[in-house]
């Protein structure tokens, strides 16, 4: 069968967290951000601290120094992390979190310091065989071996795989 989580024999928990389905609707409020174009990014975060991959907006012009988001997605047992880029769309830095369907932020650019560590990641794929090697989870999907991000078993990068000529029938990590 397909492997997509962990269990202690009594309960189970999915390995990956599905990213938010939508970005909500941006609006402007007064604040202290430099005037310019920004992007915002959303992730879901579980109570255990695991965070989904980020979904990103297109450029949003902020003329009044603040950002308001309405119609945000919600998920039971998760908070929504809101990240904001620097002026003109570079990076993604934590602006705050919410458990409601709206969020407002009007702080300074210098307040945006904690980077989004899941930007560019994707949920870890589901596979039939799995292994653990040097802080990474390995999983086989037919003839492709995927690796998680180091010390982030719930995330992977779209380019972090190895394709083999035939179907994978076991995953057995070996150290030299």
Sequence positions of predicted segments:
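Disordered, low-complexity "stalk" and linker segments at domain junctions of extracellular
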Residues: 1-135, 141-143, 158
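Conserved positions at the start
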Residues: 127, 134, 166-168, 175
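Beta-propeller domains
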Residues: 140-160
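Surface loop/turn motifs at the tips and blade-to-blade linkers of beta-strand repeat domains
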Residues: 160-165, 172
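Conserved catalytic-core segments centered on acid/base and nucleophilic motifs
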Residues: 40, 44, 169-176
